[in-house]
């Protein structure tokens, strides 16, 4: 089997309608991507699977859809206006700007220290490290650097007809703050007792200087976040619970265990508000990358908004007659990143008996863009085969493919990850049965048309 690389994944994604470069007819816009017909189905299935397990089937959690634009005081209280910065450094010869921490990490990873993290270093420490190690610009090959400066990652815009500081607002850099400011609304309206969680799926925006690796790091991205509120003193137990819950979700949807690892943050790596954080990392073709962060945020966010707004977010525990501000566990997952992980994990080039080969995307059926494809053996059979399509498409995403030979159609469906091909042949007119081919095993079984829906229902469960 050929080794996976990002170029192969990106090419397949474009060729088969998963992901296209953004604004391509105008030369594109750096690091923007549009999800094509199959990509939007895949990503929607990922979001649906997350919502199913984290909200629909959870007795603890409820959902929210907060506005992207928020009162700027939100970002003052959360610390994003003052602290949401990247350390930037420019090479004077190439005129290219880099994140200083990423320059250092890339250098150390190349030296063999795969787990080196520069998060805890001050600007002075990073500059001293770059100078002492003689780290050079990848483009110019020189070490002619500027001093390190802060660069705020928030996208700024204006509300109303005039562009003045009084009308200044921001595109949200995370979905979490919309949850925190609605904590009391949700808790009271839904009559929730601790522990409980508020989940949200939505777009966020960060003016990253060094985005890259396809849809792994982009300036516009989608998050699937849960803020889980609990009694202080129980947060480590719940952080462990959600860490394991998240890892199981990935495994149940087919992510290979050898391609994931759980990494606990060292004490000097923790954010100032966190007392425990675990990253679930995935082994992408370009290396290990963070997929999911599960952080114990303590009571930092609720207290910050209490102080800034004057509202009281404390909780009265009727069982113990205590009053306290809840602690919060945040499992935060990037929808685009995990979609990329599913693309990479599913991709396989398989050599078959007789020397033939095929490309197959082994998506879990719950995630596959199409659950099945209806393939009439002859175009003469298309009207009758279409009746099967119409019956199934009320409940499933189904493809209808009548062009080229049956073998080429099988290969095409394998390459887009369709789990089952349903062939309607001339015998189907007489016996009301179809042939169902399994994508992974390529085995075929004859089945009554009346049983196909129940068959697909069972197969897409996870």
Swiss-Prot record:
It comes from the Bacteria. Pfam families: HGTP_anticodon (PF03129), tRNA-synt_2b (PF00587). It comes from Macrococcus caseolyticus (strain JCSC5402). Its main location: cytoplasm. The keyword Aminoacyl-tRNA synthetase applies. ATP binds at residues 206-208, 216-221, 290-291, 334-337. Its EC number is 6.1.1.14. GO terms for biological process: glycyl-tRNA aminoacylation. It is found in: Cytoplasm. This is Glycine--tRNA ligase. It catalyses: tRNA(Gly) + glycine + ATP = glycyl-tRNA(Gly) + AMP + diphosphate. PROSITE patterns: AA_TRNA_LIGASE_II (PS50862). Substrate binds at residues 99, 174, 221-225, 330-334.
């Amino acid at each position: 089997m050929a080794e996976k690389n990002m170029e192969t994944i990106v090419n397949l994604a474009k060729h088969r309608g998963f992901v296209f470069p953004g604004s391509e007819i105008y030369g594109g816009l750096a690091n923007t991507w549009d999800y094509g017909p199959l990509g939007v189905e895949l990503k929607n299935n990922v979001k649906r699977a997350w919502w199913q397990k984290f909200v629909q089937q959870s007795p603890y959690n409820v959902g929210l859809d907060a506005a992207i634009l928020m009162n700027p005081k939100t970002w003052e209280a959360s610390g994003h206006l003052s602290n949401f910065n990247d350390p930037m450094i420019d090479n004077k010869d190439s005129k290219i700007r880099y994140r200083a921490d990423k320059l250092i990490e890339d250098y150390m990873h190349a030296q063999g220290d795969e787990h080196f993290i520069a998060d805890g270093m001050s600007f002075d420490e990073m500059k001293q490290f770059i100078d002492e190690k003689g780290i050079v610009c990848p483009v110019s090959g020189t070490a002619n650097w500027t001093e390190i400066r802060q660069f705020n990652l928030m996208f700024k815009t204006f509300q109303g007809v005039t562009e003045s500081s009084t009308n200044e607002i921001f595109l949200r850099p995370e979905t979490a703050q919309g949850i925190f400011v609605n904590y009391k609304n949700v808790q009271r309206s839904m009559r929730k007792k601790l522990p409980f969680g508020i989940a949200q799926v939505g777009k966020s925006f960060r003016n990253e200087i060094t985005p890259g690796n396809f849809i792994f790091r982009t300036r516009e991205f989608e998050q699937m976040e849960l803020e889980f509120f609990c009694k202080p003193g129980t947060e480590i137990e719940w952080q462990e619970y959600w860490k394991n819950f998240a890892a199981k979700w990935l495994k149940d949807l087919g992510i290979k265990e050898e391609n994931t690892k759980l990494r606990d943050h060292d004490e000097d790596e923790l954010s100032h508000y966190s007392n425990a954080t675990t990253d679930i990392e995935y082994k992408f073709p370009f290396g290990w990358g963070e997929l999911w962060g599960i952080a114990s945020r303590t009571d930092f966010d609720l207290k910050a908004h209490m102080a800034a707004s004057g509202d009281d977010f404390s909780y009265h525990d009727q069982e113990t007659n205590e009053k306290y501000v809840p602690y919060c566990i945040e499992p935060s997952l990037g929808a685009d990143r995990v979609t990329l992980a599913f693309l990479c994990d599913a991709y396989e080039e398989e050599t078959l008996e007789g020397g033939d080969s095929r490309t197959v995307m082994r998506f879990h059926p719950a995630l596959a863009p199409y659950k099945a494809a209806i393939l009439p053996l002859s175009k003469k059979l298309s009207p009758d085969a279409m009746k099967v399509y119409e019956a199934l498409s009320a409940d499933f995403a189904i493809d209808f493919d009548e062009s080229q030979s049956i073998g080429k159609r099988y290969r095409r469906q394998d390459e887009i990850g369709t789990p089952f091909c349903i062939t309607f042949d001339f015998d189907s007119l007489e016996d009301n049965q179809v042939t169902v081919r399994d994508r992974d095993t390529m085995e075929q079984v004859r089945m009554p048309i009346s049983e196909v829906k129940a068959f697909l229902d069972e197969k897409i469960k996870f």
